[in-house]
Amino acid sequence: MIRVIEKGDKVSLPFSRGILTRSITSVGIDVDLAYSIAIEVQEELVKKGKTIVTKDEIRKLTYQKLIEKGFKEEAKRYIFWRRFRKMKVPLIILLGGPTGVGKSTIATELAFRLGIRSVIGTDSIREVLRKIITPELLPTIHTSTFLAWKELKGTVTDSPIVAGFESQVSAVTVGINAIIERAVREGLNAIIEGIHVVPGFVKVEGEMTFMYMLIARSREDLEARFYERTRYSKRPADYYISHLDEILEIQDYLIRRAKKFNVPVIENVELEETVSKIMEDIMQKTIEIMKGKGLDLLEEP
Protein backbone atom coordinates (compact mmCIF):
# COMPACT_ATOMS: atom_id res chain seq x y z
CA MET A 1 0.00 0.00 0.00
CA ILE A 2 1.22 3.48 -0.88
CA ARG A 3 0.95 6.05 1.87
CA VAL A 4 1.02 9.80 1.36
CA ILE A 5 2.66 12.34 3.65
CA GLU A 6 3.05 16.10 3.61
CA LYS A 7 6.68 17.17 3.49
CA GLY A 8 7.97 17.51 7.06
CA ASP A 9 4.87 15.83 8.50
CA LYS A 10 4.81 12.47 10.29
CA VAL A 11 1.14 11.71 9.62
CA SER A 12 0.47 9.54 6.55
CA LEU A 13 -2.71 8.60 4.70
CA PRO A 14 -3.40 5.87 2.11
CA PHE A 15 -3.04 6.97 -1.52
CA SER A 16 -6.51 7.65 -2.94
CA ARG A 17 -7.27 7.54 -6.66
CA GLY A 18 -10.60 9.18 -5.88
CA ILE A 19 -9.03 12.22 -4.21
CA LEU A 20 -6.49 12.59 -7.01
CA THR A 21 -9.26 12.25 -9.61
CA ARG A 22 -11.21 15.05 -7.95
CA SER A 23 -8.18 17.34 -7.94
CA ILE A 24 -7.62 16.67 -11.66
CA THR A 25 -11.27 17.25 -12.60
CA SER A 26 -11.12 20.59 -10.77
CA VAL A 27 -9.13 22.01 -13.71
CA GLY A 28 -11.69 20.95 -16.31
CA ILE A 29 -10.56 17.41 -17.18
CA ASP A 30 -13.33 14.88 -17.85
CA VAL A 31 -13.85 12.56 -14.88
CA ASP A 32 -13.13 9.35 -16.85
CA LEU A 33 -9.86 10.74 -18.20
CA ALA A 34 -8.96 12.13 -14.77
CA TYR A 35 -9.49 8.69 -13.23
CA SER A 36 -7.31 7.03 -15.87
CA ILE A 37 -4.54 9.57 -15.13
CA ALA A 38 -4.88 8.83 -11.40
CA ILE A 39 -4.47 5.11 -12.17
CA GLU A 40 -1.36 5.86 -14.26
CA VAL A 41 0.12 7.86 -11.40
CA GLN A 42 -0.54 5.02 -8.96
CA GLU A 43 0.90 2.41 -11.34
CA GLU A 44 4.07 4.45 -11.83
CA LEU A 45 4.53 4.79 -8.07
CA VAL A 46 4.11 1.03 -7.67
CA LYS A 47 6.56 0.42 -10.52
CA LYS A 48 9.13 2.60 -8.73
CA GLY A 49 8.60 0.58 -5.56
CA LYS A 50 7.28 3.57 -3.62
CA THR A 51 5.52 2.82 -0.34
CA ILE A 52 5.84 6.34 1.11
CA VAL A 53 5.37 9.34 -1.17
CA THR A 54 5.01 13.07 -0.53
CA LYS A 55 2.13 15.18 -1.85
CA ASP A 56 4.68 17.22 -3.80
CA GLU A 57 5.83 14.07 -5.61
CA ILE A 58 2.24 13.24 -6.55
CA ARG A 59 1.67 16.79 -7.79
CA LYS A 60 4.82 16.68 -9.91
CA LEU A 61 3.96 13.30 -11.40
CA THR A 62 0.37 14.35 -12.14
CA TYR A 63 1.63 17.56 -13.74
CA GLN A 64 3.95 15.53 -15.99
CA LYS A 65 1.10 13.20 -17.02
CA LEU A 66 -1.07 16.17 -18.01
CA ILE A 67 1.78 17.68 -20.06
CA GLU A 68 2.44 14.33 -21.78
CA LYS A 69 -1.22 14.13 -22.83
CA GLY A 70 -1.17 17.64 -24.29
CA PHE A 71 -3.09 19.37 -21.49
CA LYS A 72 -0.65 22.27 -21.02
CA GLU A 73 -3.21 24.83 -19.82
CA GLU A 74 -4.88 22.29 -17.55
CA ALA A 75 -1.46 21.34 -16.15
CA LYS A 76 -0.76 24.99 -15.40
CA ARG A 77 -4.10 25.35 -13.63
CA TYR A 78 -3.54 22.09 -11.74
CA ILE A 79 -0.20 23.17 -10.30
CA PHE A 80 -1.60 26.61 -9.45
CA TRP A 81 -4.61 25.32 -7.48
CA ARG A 82 -2.57 22.66 -5.69
CA ARG A 83 -0.06 25.27 -4.54
CA PHE A 84 -2.80 27.72 -3.68
CA ARG A 85 -4.58 25.19 -1.45
CA LYS A 86 -1.28 24.25 0.19
CA MET A 87 -0.78 27.91 1.17
CA LYS A 88 -4.12 27.80 3.05
CA VAL A 89 -5.03 31.30 1.92
CA PRO A 90 -8.69 32.03 2.83
CA LEU A 91 -10.87 32.47 -0.26
CA ILE A 92 -14.31 34.09 -0.38
CA ILE A 93 -16.42 33.92 -3.54
CA LEU A 94 -19.59 36.03 -3.89
CA LEU A 95 -22.12 35.08 -6.57
CA GLY A 96 -25.00 37.39 -7.43
CA GLY A 97 -27.67 37.22 -10.11
CA PRO A 98 -31.43 37.23 -10.69
CA THR A 99 -33.87 34.57 -9.53
CA GLY A 100 -33.50 31.29 -11.42
CA VAL A 101 -30.19 31.98 -13.16
CA GLY A 102 -28.39 29.02 -11.56
CA LYS A 103 -26.37 30.59 -8.75
CA SER A 104 -26.78 27.64 -6.36
CA THR A 105 -25.67 25.11 -8.99
CA ILE A 106 -22.55 27.10 -9.85
CA ALA A 107 -21.76 27.66 -6.16
CA THR A 108 -22.03 23.93 -5.43
CA GLU A 109 -19.75 23.03 -8.34
CA LEU A 110 -17.17 25.65 -7.35
CA ALA A 111 -17.23 24.39 -3.76
CA PHE A 112 -16.61 20.83 -4.94
CA ARG A 113 -13.71 21.78 -7.21
CA LEU A 114 -12.06 24.13 -4.74
CA GLY A 115 -12.65 22.04 -1.64
CA ILE A 116 -14.73 24.75 0.04
CA ARG A 117 -17.12 23.33 2.63
CA SER A 118 -19.10 26.44 3.47
CA VAL A 119 -21.72 27.46 0.88
CA ILE A 120 -24.25 29.99 2.15
CA GLY A 121 -27.39 31.06 0.31
CA THR A 122 -28.69 34.55 1.01
CA ASP A 123 -32.24 33.16 1.04
CA SER A 124 -31.28 31.41 4.29
CA ILE A 125 -30.18 34.73 5.79
CA ARG A 126 -33.48 36.28 4.72
CA GLU A 127 -35.39 33.39 6.30
CA VAL A 128 -33.65 33.98 9.64
CA LEU A 129 -34.56 37.67 9.45
CA ARG A 130 -38.19 36.76 8.78
CA LYS A 131 -38.25 34.80 12.04
CA ILE A 132 -36.94 37.66 14.16
CA ILE A 133 -38.39 40.73 12.39
CA THR A 134 -42.16 41.04 12.07
CA PRO A 135 -43.90 41.97 8.79
CA GLU A 136 -45.16 45.13 10.48
CA LEU A 137 -41.61 46.27 11.18
CA LEU A 138 -39.98 45.30 7.86
CA PRO A 139 -42.60 44.09 5.36
CA THR A 140 -40.32 43.95 2.30
CA ILE A 141 -38.34 40.94 3.57
CA HIS A 142 -41.49 38.86 3.97
CA THR A 143 -42.09 38.42 0.25
CA SER A 144 -40.21 37.57 -2.94
CA THR A 145 -37.58 40.05 -4.14
CA PHE A 146 -39.60 40.83 -7.26
CA LEU A 147 -42.77 41.52 -5.22
CA ALA A 148 -41.18 43.54 -2.41
CA TRP A 149 -42.26 46.79 -4.12
CA LYS A 150 -45.88 46.05 -3.16
CA GLU A 151 -44.92 46.48 0.50
CA LEU A 152 -43.39 49.93 0.07
CA LYS A 153 -45.01 52.86 1.83
CA GLY A 154 -45.17 56.32 0.31
CA THR A 155 -44.31 57.52 -3.19
CA VAL A 156 -41.49 56.03 -5.25
CA THR A 157 -40.03 58.36 -7.89
CA ASP A 158 -38.08 55.79 -9.93
CA SER A 159 -38.78 52.09 -10.54
CA PRO A 160 -40.91 50.67 -7.70
CA ILE A 161 -39.65 47.15 -8.49
CA VAL A 162 -36.03 48.22 -8.00
CA ALA A 163 -36.92 50.28 -4.92
CA GLY A 164 -38.64 47.30 -3.30
CA PHE A 165 -35.74 45.04 -4.21
CA GLU A 166 -33.21 47.47 -2.72
CA SER A 167 -35.25 47.65 0.47
CA GLN A 168 -35.00 43.88 0.93
CA VAL A 169 -31.33 43.83 -0.11
CA SER A 170 -30.47 46.51 2.47
CA ALA A 171 -31.79 44.30 5.25
CA VAL A 172 -30.27 41.00 4.08
CA THR A 173 -26.91 42.65 3.33
CA VAL A 174 -26.38 43.23 7.06
CA GLY A 175 -26.19 39.46 7.52
CA ILE A 176 -24.07 38.93 4.39
CA ASN A 177 -21.50 41.51 5.48
CA ALA A 178 -21.35 40.01 8.97
CA ILE A 179 -20.53 36.59 7.49
CA ILE A 180 -17.84 38.07 5.22
CA GLU A 181 -16.29 39.99 8.13
CA ARG A 182 -16.12 36.84 10.24
CA ALA A 183 -14.68 34.76 7.38
CA VAL A 184 -11.95 37.35 6.76
CA ARG A 185 -11.22 37.73 10.47
CA GLU A 186 -10.96 33.99 11.11
CA GLY A 187 -9.36 33.03 7.79
CA LEU A 188 -12.26 30.88 6.56
CA ASN A 189 -13.15 29.82 3.01
CA ALA A 190 -16.72 30.51 1.95
CA ILE A 191 -19.00 30.87 -1.04
CA ILE A 192 -21.99 33.18 -0.61
CA GLU A 193 -24.60 33.06 -3.35
CA GLY A 194 -27.92 34.76 -3.84
CA ILE A 195 -29.86 37.55 -5.45
CA HIS A 196 -29.01 39.78 -2.48
CA VAL A 197 -25.30 39.78 -3.42
CA VAL A 198 -25.45 43.25 -4.97
CA PRO A 199 -22.35 45.35 -5.77
CA GLY A 200 -22.24 48.45 -3.61
CA PHE A 201 -24.37 46.89 -0.88
CA VAL A 202 -22.10 43.93 -0.11
CA LYS A 203 -18.65 44.84 1.19
CA VAL A 204 -15.84 43.12 -0.69
CA GLU A 205 -13.38 42.79 2.19
CA GLY A 206 -9.94 41.22 1.94
CA GLU A 207 -7.72 40.85 -1.12
CA MET A 208 -8.92 37.26 -1.67
CA THR A 209 -12.63 38.10 -1.88
CA PHE A 210 -14.05 37.91 -5.40
CA MET A 211 -17.52 38.86 -6.66
CA TYR A 212 -19.27 37.75 -9.86
CA MET A 213 -22.64 38.56 -11.39
CA LEU A 214 -24.37 35.67 -13.17
CA ILE A 215 -27.07 36.56 -15.69
CA ALA A 216 -29.38 34.82 -18.14
CA ARG A 217 -28.58 35.25 -21.84
CA SER A 218 -32.21 35.86 -22.79
CA ARG A 219 -35.79 35.81 -21.59
CA GLU A 220 -36.26 32.40 -23.21
CA ASP A 221 -33.22 30.96 -21.42
CA LEU A 222 -34.47 32.12 -18.03
CA GLU A 223 -37.96 30.77 -18.71
CA ALA A 224 -36.48 27.39 -19.66
CA ARG A 225 -34.48 27.35 -16.42
CA PHE A 226 -37.65 27.73 -14.34
CA TYR A 227 -39.24 24.74 -16.07
CA GLU A 228 -36.03 22.72 -15.63
CA ARG A 229 -35.96 23.58 -11.93
CA THR A 230 -39.36 21.95 -11.32
CA ARG A 231 -37.73 18.55 -11.92
CA TYR A 232 -35.93 18.70 -8.56
CA SER A 233 -37.77 21.44 -6.67
CA LYS A 234 -41.27 22.01 -5.31
CA ARG A 235 -41.22 25.59 -6.59
CA PRO A 236 -43.76 25.93 -9.45
CA ALA A 237 -42.42 27.37 -12.71
CA ASP A 238 -45.63 29.25 -13.49
CA TYR A 239 -45.31 31.43 -10.39
CA TYR A 240 -41.94 32.77 -11.53
CA ILE A 241 -42.79 32.97 -15.22
CA SER A 242 -45.83 35.11 -14.40
CA HIS A 243 -43.39 37.60 -12.87
CA LEU A 244 -40.68 37.32 -15.54
CA ASP A 245 -40.89 41.01 -16.44
CA GLU A 246 -40.09 42.00 -12.85
CA ILE A 247 -37.28 39.43 -12.60
CA LEU A 248 -35.69 40.70 -15.83
CA GLU A 249 -35.97 44.30 -14.64
CA ILE A 250 -34.01 43.28 -11.53
CA GLN A 251 -31.46 41.54 -13.79
CA ASP A 252 -30.98 44.77 -15.78
CA TYR A 253 -30.48 46.63 -12.50
CA LEU A 254 -27.91 44.06 -11.31
CA ILE A 255 -25.98 44.39 -14.57
CA ARG A 256 -25.83 48.17 -14.16
CA ARG A 257 -24.59 47.81 -10.58
CA ALA A 258 -21.98 45.25 -11.60
CA LYS A 259 -20.62 47.50 -14.34
CA LYS A 260 -20.56 50.48 -11.98
CA PHE A 261 -18.47 48.59 -9.43
CA ASN A 262 -16.30 46.67 -11.95
CA VAL A 263 -17.76 43.27 -11.07
CA PRO A 264 -17.41 40.65 -13.86
CA VAL A 265 -20.74 39.83 -15.53
CA ILE A 266 -21.02 36.24 -16.78
CA GLU A 267 -23.80 34.80 -18.94
CA ASN A 268 -24.57 31.47 -17.30
CA VAL A 269 -25.32 29.31 -20.33
CA GLU A 270 -23.34 26.14 -19.62
CA LEU A 271 -22.06 25.01 -16.22
CA GLU A 272 -18.53 24.00 -17.25
CA GLU A 273 -17.98 27.25 -19.14
CA THR A 274 -19.22 29.43 -16.28
CA VAL A 275 -17.20 27.60 -13.62
CA SER A 276 -14.08 27.72 -15.80
CA LYS A 277 -14.45 31.48 -16.34
CA ILE A 278 -14.75 32.13 -12.62
CA MET A 279 -11.83 29.87 -11.69
CA GLU A 280 -9.65 31.37 -14.44
CA ASP A 281 -10.45 34.90 -13.26
CA ILE A 282 -9.65 34.02 -9.64
CA MET A 283 -6.43 32.35 -10.76
CA GLN A 284 -5.21 35.32 -12.82
CA LYS A 285 -6.04 37.84 -10.08
CA THR A 286 -4.41 35.65 -7.42
CA ILE A 287 -1.26 35.26 -9.53
CA GLU A 288 -0.94 39.06 -9.66
CA ILE A 289 -1.57 39.39 -5.91
CA MET A 290 1.06 36.76 -5.11
CA LYS A 291 3.56 38.22 -7.57
CA GLY A 292 3.36 41.42 -5.55
CA LYS A 293 4.49 39.33 -2.58
CA GLY A 294 7.35 37.74 -4.49
CA LEU A 295 5.62 34.38 -5.04
CA ASP A 296 5.34 32.55 -8.38
CA LEU A 297 2.50 30.04 -8.28
CA LEU A 298 3.05 28.96 -11.90
CA GLU A 299 6.68 27.89 -11.58
CA GLU A 300 7.13 24.40 -13.02
CA PRO A 301 7.52 21.72 -10.33
From Swiss-Prot:
Family: Belongs to the 2-phosphoglycerate kinase family.
The keyword Kinase belongs to this UniProt entry's keyword annotation: yes
Descriptive protein name: 2-phosphoglycerate kinase
Underlying gene: pgk2
NCBIfam families per the UniProt record, alphabetical: PRK04220.1 (NF003259)
One Pfam family it belongs to: ATP-cone
Cofactor: a divalent metal cation
InterPro entries: 2PKG, ATP-cone_dom, P-loop_NTPase
Cysteine-cysteine disulfides: none
Keyword Kinase tagged: yes
PANTHER family attached to this UniProt entry: P-LOOP NTPASE DOMAIN-CONTAINING PROTEIN LPA1 HOMOLOG 1
GO molecular function terms attached to this record: ATP binding; kinase activity; phosphotransferase activity, carboxyl group as acceptor
This enzyme's EC code(s): 2.7.2.16
Pathway participation: Thermoadapter biosynthesis; cyclic 2,3-diphosphoglycerate biosynthesis; cyclic 2,3-diphosphoglycerate from 2-phospho-D-glycerate: step 1/2
